[in-house]
Each structure stands twice: as C-alpha cells, then as structure tokens.
Amino acid sequence: SPASGISKMDEWHVSVVAETGSTNDDLLRAAEQGELADRTVLRTEHQTAGRGRLDRRWDAPAGSNLLASMYLMSPGDRPTSMLQRVGVAIVDAVNQLAGLKIEASNRATLGLKWPNDVLYDGRKLAGVLAQRSTSAPGLIVGFGVNVAWAPPEAARVNDLVDCTAEQLLVEVLTAFDAQSGDPAVLAQAYRARL
C-alpha cells in the first residue's frame, strides 16, 4: 500500500461518458449485474436525470460541472459515513486547488452543511448522495459540484479557483484517499468543516 500522502489514483477505475441519465443509476445497474470493480468512478459531461437528496433534480449545462459517482465495495461502510467522507474530500480538494488552509477562519467561507451539502459563502457548491443496492454489495456515492456554472442562488468552484471538472475529480479522489478510515477520526474531520 502506498505511503500516506502518495497518490493512489492508479487504484481508481475512472470512466468518462459524454451524457447519461444518472451516474448513480448506471453504477447501481452495473453493480447489480456484478460488473463493477471496487473503486469504480463514472464521470459524465452531462446528466439528464441527475438528482439530489429527496429526489431533487440536479441539472447543469453540458461540460460545466463535476458530475460523478463512485462504487465502493466496503459492506461495513455506512452510507452516512461515506456521505461525510466524500463531503470532506470535496471541501479539502477545493481548498487544495485554491491554496487555502483547513482552519477555523475558512470554515465560514467554505464548509459543510449537514447532511450532504458543501457551501461557499452560504451558497450551495456541491451535493452528495449515497445509495445501496438491495441485491449487490457495496455503496454508490454520487456527487455534483458546480465548477464553471451554477444556478443564481448557488456558488461555483471557479469563484475560488480556475480549474476543470477533471482536475477537481483527481483532487477529490486524492483527498478521499488521504482520510482515515477510522469512523471517529472521520466524524471529527466532518465536524471540523461544519
């Protein structure tokens, strides 16, 4: 296993498609057919049936935002823990790209809102959604991050730093891997970013 701080990007199986209904639905179907490896990520340029918590619609112009889902074959991982872990990873990735430090002074600007939102200056920057299949092991965690486009009441990563969805995905996966798997440590990291 690579030493802490060394990228584990080669352990992720990342695919990109131009358009799909929902990356979560695609991975869920593939998991149920036994076709997925652990740490599979599906990113799309455009999602036509994306949704967030409470089945709220999540839509953006093609190519403008990070729309992705990951499949984690860790039956012990509770959906809430993975929501938190991905939320922390998104905050840390944006902080890393923007050159910000994780400290109390930044929390008011960039942080988490329970249970599954990332906010920048009080406006939604990202959302995370976890789903389990009833017939396959593992967990699907989808996330949408406003990178280059956001609705009027929301924020976008490009308000902080100029980057692409592809660059942000690499940082999110790297930040995800940098976190401890210990639930107590994860809970502390999550609370520190609220």
Q: Predicted segment positions?
A:
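Long, positively charged amphipathic alpha-helical accessory segments at protein N-termini or as interdomain linkers
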Residues: 1-7, 75-109, 120-194
